[in-house]
Amino acid sequence: MKIRLYGETMVVGNIIEGGKTVLNLTKEILEKEDENLKVSYPGTNYNLPIIYGLLGKKIETVKDLKELINSLEIKDEETLENALDAGVVTLICAEAIEALKYAKSEKPYKEPYVGFIPDEILRGLGVPLVEGKIPAILVVIGKVGDKEKLKKLIDDIKKRNILALLVGDIVKEMDEADIEYGLDKLLVPVGNEITSAIHAANLAIRAPLIFGGIEPGKTEEIIDYLKNRVPAVVVALGELDNITLAAGAGCIKAGVPVITNNEVPVIKGALESSDIDNIVENALKMKGVKVKVVEFDIPVSVGPMNEGERVRGPDMYVELAGPKSYGFELVKVVNKAEDKVEIIGKDIDEMEEGSRNPFAIIVEVSGSNLEEDLEGVLERRIHEFLNYIEGVMHLNQRDQVWIRINKNSFNKGLRLKHIGEVVKQLFKEHFPIVEKCNVIIITDPDKVKEELEKAKEIYKKRDEKTKSIREEDVDVFYGCVMCQSFAPTHVCIITPDRPSLCGSINYLDARAAAKIDPNGPIFEIPKGECLDEKLGIYTGVNEVVRERSQGSVEEMALHSALTNPCTSCGCFEAIVFYIPEVDGFGVAHRNFRGETPFGLPFSTLAGQCSGGKQVPGFVGISISYMKSPKFLQGDGGWERVVWLPKELKERVKDAIPEELYDKIATEEDVKTTDELIKFLKEKGHPIVKKTEEEVVEEVEEEKEEVKATEEEKEGIEVGELITKLAKEGGIQIIMKNVKIVINLNVKR
């Protein structure tokens, strides 16, 4: 039965009825199942997330589920508290029903629906969420019922670059309206049935576990985290049945507010009503999220929602630069730019369809606080800004640049002038220190060649300058607390030899960011006195970390995984983990889906140190740090690395000492620590020799100690020795002249 709701009492009653319906249905479903059937979701270390997160209970079989579900009850009295509790029961039951689907089928969801969203994807969303690039997550449930209103709703979501998790009839409506969706567009169809909404809820519930480091079962802490740190809102559209209302109540209880285009009793910040035309903006207000929407006077859309778009050969109108032509991109700081866009050569409509053409884009920027050292940092943003443009695909950088423009955008009227205007506007929008900006686009072949040679000289000078910078050459490091919105005690330290662990910020990036926004999340750290050069311990770093971590971290070693390692949030590209059986290290990257020699996947290992924790033996890192000359130097560097996934090993091949490359195992070489030990011995890894030498050294030291003790004891009468030991208490063993005396009754 579907109804519209106007009174608080009626809503409470509907929620309780909906919760009871779901609870009874779940009991009936479970009663028919084999108790020994294993239940879990693929790709997560937090099974089953809602139950594990809120209750701290690990569910492994149908029997476990039955025991839990049969212990649940919903009170009849129509109070708000009982309704919210009924909502939580509804979420738990939905989790049980959905988990059963995965127990019976490897892939219960067929396209276009995705169902359960793995940890890997959530971790991948971490950086854009903390940066604010993805400002919010909207769980959109139900049906719009009007094609034009649907288009406006989706447009409002897209131009704000919001991640939308779609449940119910809205997906079919989007199909009928020819609106594209997918993770690359941040419009994710989760499922058609209301129980599939649990996959949006269990995505949210994993945020405090993964990024916040909160222990499962600490319900109040998890709810507080969701309420104050996760920018998620449920948008319930169209007529709502009792079960949908109950699920919504569960979300409210868990700290995720609900907004609907129905008339409902308002609970400010928890349950609100809005007309559909303004529902996106009002949803953001419930979480205090402000998004500035920049308008562009061009014939196609512009924004982060277009990033990741691919232009395949059959869809391509023209290709600019790329492997079969030539070109470059360059940013130059000049004395006085004029805010102009200039095209030298043919525009797109003068090029032959399907052709490949030389291309250059030169961005000249001026401003009182700009300096030459910022050119490279600004230049890397060209890639991002061009990919903001609908129908434009930009790959690579510098003189390897490769651009394609698709037929649809060309037919809508997109031209080079528009591309130049977007780049100019975005540079000024994103970088307030850029006061004026010229964009010069060149397609004339001879002119591109001429300017290309000049650009190569500039690249060369930059690289020489950058390569020469080391930690010992600078007085200032940089800190980043961007991730504290998710991991409150995490402080990332960025040096010339250690990029941010998310991999997105190097030393020059951090320097530019601190200069552009002195009050922002990236800031200077005077490095102070070096206490240990090998480990990378500095007084200035310790002072800042102590203050910014709320006193939870006293000291931090920049280049060690064993001695006071750096804290980790949840966005790291890879994790270093200690393998005690071989006294060495393994490194697993985020995209590795297999198991390490421990028998554990990346997600499990990552859970050991994420959330801003400092855990000796585990540390999150960026992949680019593996190419640093100071990589784990406090622990022995590459000579202590014994295991890498094959894909990662290939990616960092140039950084691995040549004589070590074949001696480092991959998942194809070993599956267990026993196999790893055997592999390292066969290959003659330095760690084997080091371990053997240490054992010999320890034995020799023990021999010397025994000898010294015997020499010390010579001349001492046995009686004296016994008296002396007796004062110390305990069992006395005297091995002088092979005489053994044992006293079990010595009093202190």
From Swiss-Prot:
Name of this protein: Acetyl-CoA decarbonylase/synthase complex subunit beta 1
Annotated EC: 2.3.1.169
Keyword Iron appears in the UniProt entry: yes
GO terms (BP aspect): acetyl-CoA metabolic process
Cofactor note: Binds 1 [Ni-Fe-S] cluster.
Record-stated family: Belongs to the CdhC family.
Reported cofactor(s): [Ni-Fe-S] cluster
Organism: Methanocaldococcus jannaschii (strain ATCC 43067 / DSM 2661 / JAL-1 / JCM 10045 / NBRC 100440) (Methanococcus jannaschii)
Domain of life: Archaea
Entry-linked Gene3D superfamilies: 3.40.50.2030, Bifunctional carbon monoxide dehydrogenase/acetyl-coa synthase(codh/acs), Chain M, domain 3, Bifunctional carbon monoxide dehydrogenase/acetyl-coa synthase(codh/acs), Chain M, domain 5, Carbon monoxide dehydrogenase alpha subunit. Chain D, domain 4, Carbon monoxide dehydrogenase alpha subunit. Chain M, domain 1
